[in-house]
Amino acid sequence: MDQSTTQIYKRLISYVGAYRTVAIVAIIGMIGYSGMDALFIQLMKPFIDEGLNERNADVLKYAPFVVIALVIGRGVFNFMSSYCLSYVGSQVVRSLRQELFEHILHLPVSFHDKNSTGDLISKITFDTEQVQQAITKALLIVVREGAFVVFLLAVMFYTSWQLSLIFLVIIPLVAVIVTVVSKRFRHISKSIQSAMGQVTRSSEQMLSGHKVIHGFGGQNQEIDQFSKVNNHNRQQRIKMDATKALSVSIIQVLAASAMAVILWVVSMPSMIDTISSGDFVVLISSMMMLLRPLKQLANVNSDMQRGVSAAQSVFLILDEEVEKDTGTVSVDKVKGLIEVKNVTFKYPTKDEPVLNNLSLTIKAGESIALVGRSGSGKSTISNLLPRYYDLEAPSEILLDGIALHDYKLTDLRRQFALVSQQVVLFNDSIANNICYGLQREISQQELEKVAKQAHVWEFVKDLPEQLNTMVGENGVMLSGGQRQRIAIARAILKDAPILILDEATSALDTESEKLIQQALEALMKDKTSIVIAHRLSTIENSDRIYVIDNGSVIESGDHLSLLANNGTYSALCKMQFGEQG
């Protein structure tokens, strides 16, 4: 639902509550700064009328001291407002960015399926930075220049309320212009944020896929793609600047027109004798000085609308419902009995179900394998077990006789160790990647033991920093096989009662695969193991093999019995082993 600017700004200002005292000091500084400028104009009257016109040197000799005092006061108030407002703005943006980061971490996997990484990165980095513009620069100008306008109008009315009324005629016209332009700014600001998301997404795609781009000669394609989104971003910013320039020009023409009318009225014989030289100078100076704050107030509208639009996009993410954790059952370690009952499931972004009334049972400590062609639903089962997605009745998965949704999420996910074909490593040391998410302290000896079990130590021992070696972004400094061994070491260290091996040895050479297979067999002992594999040679020793096609189990049994059936599994074996032969 589209929220009004006022609602969004109120919600944004609520973040200032923790820094209320500093914010009040900033507001006092802004008002004081404007007061010094207005007071300087007002003091021109006695200096002109009593000092110059009456040739009174006693009045004029105070002028230098007054000017110095006003400039010093102005400087003090300027520092108060600028520093305190910058402090509040940076703290609010830090809090908002931290809250957004933490909230995204707790959103369900289905949310990430529907939102691109580039767009989310843009919200965390670019949009939150735009919010600071609404809090600091915009608020500074609105309060300080707004107060200056009020003070100048007060000076004008005190000097000549009749002439000041003429100037007030333009206020409703300015208000209409600001209202119309605000809607335009808000619309363009949303387009700018969307365009920046496209720029970030295109950049992220280029950086993460640079090897494929080089390998397939796709540089020109990526250049054209980025050029389009980059130019679209430029067009939106030009629209913003054009709207800003037009609105400022119109407001300045209106103000100048009002000033011209006042000068014409003052020139009339009936008026020329009613105001003194000092009154005239104060009045004209006030009107001239009004042009600056009116221009800045018109300009700041774009910054404010840009910040409000950015805040709205951030709040839309913050209003997304976090992953539901309705479970009440706590458990340290399960036995590992898994019962999949009549499961039909489709991904939120898909129209057709991936699993169709699928049922299977995995006994505690049993090693089972899931085989089938790509897209048959094997990996979906591994996504459902840790409850990355929720099932709808009557579909149900039980763990030790208890439905998955009855377990507390943290306790449930502690029961699974996943080694996937797509290994995710963080830009940290090998040791920290192996220990990722571990809730206990670990000794160097234990860490090295795990590294040796997973055959990580073989390529680490000769490195200068050994386990403290940095792996680079997503393990770019390592080979595919080395990354997979680190993932296996991570699973060994977690020591979960249920193992999910999704093509866990697919990136390994034959020699490494044999070594890892030995480590996995030792690891799988006394654990419930689910092996998803295309290479059937890795699953021959499984207690039970389930053949899945179109989301349903079409065959099950051990390796020898399935071969004897001469069914789908037998055909797959003949095809693979025939190719290998």
UniProtKB/Swiss-Prot annotation:
GO terms for molecular function: ABC-type oligopeptide transporter activity; ATP binding; ATP hydrolysis activity; ATPase-coupled lipid transmembrane transporter activity. GO terms for cellular component: plasma membrane. It is found in: Cell inner membrane. InterPro entries: AAA+_ATPase, ABC1_TM_dom, ABC1_TM_sf, ABC_transporter-like_ATP-bd, ABC_transporter-like_CS, ABC_transpr_lipidA, P-loop_NTPase, Type_1_exporter. The chain crosses the membrane at residues 21-41, 65-85, 138-158, 161-181, 246-266, 271-291. It catalyses: ATP + H2O + lipid A-core oligosaccharideSide 1 = ADP + phosphate + lipid A-core oligosaccharideSide 2. Residues 24-306 form the ABC transmembrane type-1 domain. Gene3D superfamilies: ABC transporter type 1, transmembrane domain (1.20.1560.10), P-loop containing nucleotide triphosphate hydrolases (3.40.50.300). Residues 338-575 form the ABC transporter domain. PROSITE patterns: ABC_TM1F (PS50929), ABC_TRANSPORTER_1 (PS00211), ABC_TRANSPORTER_2 (PS50893), MSBA (PS51239). Its main location: membrane. ATP binds at residues 372-379. Keywords: ATP-binding, Cell inner membrane, Cell membrane, Lipid transport, Membrane, Nucleotide-binding, Translocase, Transmembrane, Transmembrane helix, Transport. Its EC number is 7.5.2.6. It is a multi-pass membrane protein. Pfam families: ABC_membrane, ABC_tran. It is an enzyme of class 7 (translocase). Homodimer. Involved in lipopolysaccharide (LPS) biosynthesis. Translocates lipid A-core from the inner to the outer leaflet of the inner membrane. Transmembrane domains (TMD) form a pore in the inner membrane and the ATP-binding domain (NBD) is responsible for energy generation. Belongs to the ABC transporter superfamily. Lipid exporter (TC 3.A.1.106) family. In MsbA the ATP-binding domain (NBD) and the transmembrane domain (TMD) are fused. PANTHER family: ATP-BINDING CASSETTE SUB-FAMILY B MEMBER 10, MITOCHONDRIAL, ATP-DEPENDENT PERMEASE MDL1, MITOCHONDRIAL. This is ATP-dependent lipid A-core flippase. The gene is msbA.
